[in-house]
């Protein structure tokens, strides 16, 4: 019986801590350069919570499917290049 293709773990070293699978990193890299700033800031804020990372990728995939021909708005989608309320890392003591 033929086996379904498996997801490849990891991406580049700097992306290892953020996304577990290379496909997730590719999706984030593509979409984060094209989404409106408000959506990007919301996703950056959600990425600070490990439990919401899968939800961010799912929303990014849906956005990518709906906006397949979206123009590039920025060179990079990282926190350093896109300061804002979503880029501030929160220190919370429980």
Swiss-Prot record:
Keywords: Cell cycle, Host nucleus, Virion. The keyword Acetylation does not apply. One of its GO terms (cellular component) is host cell nucleus. It is found in: Virion; Host nucleus. This is Probable Vpr-like protein. Seems to function as a Vpr-like protein, since it mediates host cell cycle arrest in G2 phase. Cell cycle arrest creates a favorable environment for maximizing viral expression and production.
């Amino acid at each position: 019986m033929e086996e379904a293709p498996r997801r490849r773990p990891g991406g580049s070293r700097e992306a290892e801590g953020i996304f577990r699978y290379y496909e997730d990193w590719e999706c984030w890299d593509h979409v984060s350069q094209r989404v409106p700033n408000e959506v990007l800031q919301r996703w950056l804020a959600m990425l600070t919570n490990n439990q919401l990372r899968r939800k961010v990728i799912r929303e990014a995939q849906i956005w990518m499917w709906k906006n397949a021909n979206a123009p590039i708005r920025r060179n990079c989608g990282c926190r350093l290049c896109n300061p804002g309320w979503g880029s501030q890392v929160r220190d919370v003591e429980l």
